């Protein structure tokens, strides 16, 4: 099983609509680790680590977002896995 790490940035109407909690639930459902946080520019940033197939599914779910969000763009940069052990919501930056 190949582990991957994806650093993602979601743009659109994604703050104030529970997007971070949506991301947290998707990561838990797919048994992935990492973090998510709001950025002061209105985007949502995060990192997810796990098996490649599950990470791809997670990113697809982020592109769809919850019903009340409006996702305009998801940028993804793959990095070397760093051994994240949980998935958490971080403070905004």
UniProtKB/Swiss-Prot annotation:
InterPro entries recorded: Acylphosphatase, Acylphosphatase-like_dom, Acylphosphatase-like_dom_sf, Acylphosphatase_CS
Query: Which residues does the UniProt record annotate as the domain Acylphosphatase-like?
Result: 5-91
* Top-tier EC class: hydrolase
Q: Which PROSITE patterns match?
A: ACYLPHOSPHATASE_1, ACYLPHOSPHATASE_2, ACYLPHOSPHATASE_3
Enzyme Commission (EC) number = 3.6.1.7
- Catalytic residues, per the record, are 20, 38
Q: Which reactions is this enzyme annotated as catalysing?
A: an acyl phosphate + H2O = a carboxylate + phosphate + H(+)
SUPFAM superfamilies noted in UniProt: Acylphosphatase/BLUF domain-like
GO terms for MF:
acylphosphatase activity
**Gene3D superfamilies from the UniProt entry:** 3.30.70.100
Q: Which UniProt keywords apply?
A: Hydrolase
Family of this protein: Belongs to the acylphosphatase family.
By its UniProt entry, which PANTHER family does this protein fall under?
A: ACYLPHOSPHATASE
Record-given protein name: Acylphosphatase
Lineage runs:
Bacteria, Bacillati, Bacillota, Clostridia, Moorellales
The gene that this protein is the product of is acyP
